[in-house]
Amino acid sequence: MSRNQSREARPNREVAQTVSERVYVETQGCQMNDYDAERLVDVLVSQAGARRVDRPEEADLLLLNTCSVREKAQEKVFSQLGRWRRYKQDNPTVLIGVGGCVASQEGAEILRRAPFVDLVFGPQTLHRLPQMLARRRSGASAQVDVDFPEIEKFDHLPQPRAEGPTAYVSVMEGCSKYCSFCVVPYTRGDEISRPVADVLAEVRSLAEQGVREVNLLGQNVNAYAGALDDGERADLGLLIEAVARIPGIDRIRFTTSHPAEFHSGLIDAYRDVPELADFLHLPVQSGSDLILKLMKRGHDIAAYEALIDQIRAVRPGLVLATDLIVGFPGETEAEFEETLAMVDRVGFDGGAFSFVYSPRPGTPAAELHDGVPEADKRAWLQRLQARLHEQQSAAARALLGTRQSVLIDGPSRRDPRELSGRTSGNRVVNFPGDPSWIGRFAEVEITDARTHSLRGRVVSVEGQAMHAAVGAGG
């Protein structure tokens, strides 16, 4: 019996008194927040008899899962809370909770600015929400719990419920790199890895529910060092090999990585594990060694480019994506040109998340003199994004006429009457098809290429006899 199962089996008398809640969850930010939101719902369903609703006006409990990475994150949170306040005014039994990284950063300060909030919890304490909710429903004052209790939360979460053929699995929490611009170590704590057995148990549970693809999550996921049963530690490469052996799991992704800890075992996984997708998101942030040093990234641009060469040597079809920041304190036109030159040399055919630098409270970079004119920052961002757009568009056009293996994950967002899926290289493909195909792999011929999505016709579907290609170009 796993630790999760043994904890699950214990009745929680405090939570047993809680009325059934209709819960609405709104999530901001990264994939880790998406994962946390789903697990938050799982624990409320399991321990508090909750059910999820799709509209805030239907809810007894409104939860905002927040992100603090980008500019004005706090103001966005309080703006949303202000909009939700009317639900509480209309019905005083409605409770409002704030979780995620802004909650971790602000703590009880949220109650000072928004005294109508009932619950404040951090990423590491979301499993305690049923108890906090029960106390608040019983008449206690507003509840605040934003501690960093290491890996405790995973011991209290029920096994996840699959909602389609793809799923996120958190394998570690926190980050210990302390890049000068980044707030994550202060809101999610230092790196803590889940034991290998716990991760594999979660993946097996998902596979038994029909999941075909898992995305292993961590703020610095390639620093993973999970405990094995013999007390030794497994790196991310070994974990990927173990996940690939689980029946039913046919594709594996991971995110997000740091170049300074991309070890040889992970490169070997790209060589030896065919289930590992032809995709890598590896943030570089800048093409200037001076700026990388100010950012405290722990590597120079030559090391980044050498690493990419090593990975591409063992996985020639790799699609590469990254993160880039412009306008960091101390950056000049010369440093920005170095970033453009690096983009040209490396080639980010998978695109990039690119932003103008914004200081985050409490980080070392926030203390640096920011003498970069705002007009320069905006102009640099436009030039950078234009260059990245060219690369991504060219890579998409190069796929015209090729056949791609696509995991069909649901209706198309562009046209719900059609289907959609992703290639191994993480490219979205839309095509006509039968909803019964969802959860299967299909061979799709690419007939039209746009920067952010492809269109194709189905040539074959796993386990399906095909008499003719399905779909049309255009």
UniProtKB/Swiss-Prot annotation:
Its cofactor is [4Fe-4S] cluster. Residues 397-460 form the TRAM domain. GO terms for molecular function: 4 iron, 4 sulfur cluster binding; metal ion binding; N6-isopentenyladenosine methylthiotransferase activity. Residues 161-395 form the Radical SAM core domain. CDD domains: Radical_SAM. It is an enzyme of class 2 (transferase). Catalyzes the methylthiolation of N6-(dimethylallyl)adenosine (i(6)A), leading to the formation of 2-methylthio-N6-(dimethylallyl)adenosine (ms(2)i(6)A) at position 37 in tRNAs that read codons beginning with uridine. Its main location: cytoplasm. It is found in: Cytoplasm. It holds the Pfam family UPF0004. [4Fe-4S] cluster 1 binds at C30, C67, C101. This is tRNA-2-methylthio-N(6)-dimethylallyladenosine synthase. Belongs to the methylthiotransferase family. MiaB subfamily. GO terms for cellular component: cytosol. The keyword Metal-binding applies. Keywords: 4Fe-4S, Cytoplasm, Iron, Iron-sulfur, Metal-binding, S-adenosyl-L-methionine, Transferase, tRNA processing.
